[in-house]
Amino acid sequence: MHEGTYDDKITKGDNYEHTFLGEPTGLQKKSVNFTTIEEERLSKVVLVVDDDPDMTSVFSLGLQDEGFEVYTYNDPLEVLSQFRRNFYDLLLVDINMPKMNGIDLSRKLLELDSNVKICFITAGEANIEVLRELYPTRGIGCFIRKPVTIGELVRRVRAELD
């Protein structure tokens, strides 16, 4: 009887069939579909930080419907204490938040993970071109003006991740 382990490369959507000795009927086949496991691992991970819980909920639901794995925070200081290095593919960060603005938060997060991509979310009255000139921080890829439709949000997120 084999009691060791084996390694096999299984990709998204693969079915895997394994034959093993069972009791008492002898040989049995077991099919496992790894789609769900692999989709979780392969989906892009987005962190949304906005002090407005309604905004994080709407963004989260819209992005999840499009296959993204989404984590949300309403407190920028909590993000700093919970941030996981090399985990997130993209951060969506509101600029105007109490306790710490999104620009300062983004700088600190880039110190923790210099490879993460960041998009700022800003209210309609903000001048995005001025912000882009004032904060040419490495890793800041885009500015998204609120209000934004879910379709536009998803399009911008996908463009940033491609």
PLM regions: where:
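Two-component/phosphorelay signaling modules centered on CheY-like receiver
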Residues: P53-Y71, R138, E160
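Acidic catalytic/metal-coordinating carboxylates
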Residues: N74-D75, N101-L105
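Non-catalytic signal-transmission and effector/linker regions of two-component phosphorelay proteins
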Residues: M1-V45, T149-D162
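Alpha4 helix (beta4-alpha4-beta5 surface) of REC/receiver domains from two-component response regulators
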Residues: D104, E125-I144, G151-R155
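Acidic, metal-coordinating helix/loop segments flanking the phosphotransfer/catalytic sites
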Residues: T72-L90
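Active-site residues of response regulator receiver
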Residues: D94
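Hydrophobic/aromatic residues positioned on beta-strands within the core alpha/beta folds
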Residues: I121-A123
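Receiver (REC) domain active-site loop signature in two-component systems and cognate sites
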Residues: M97
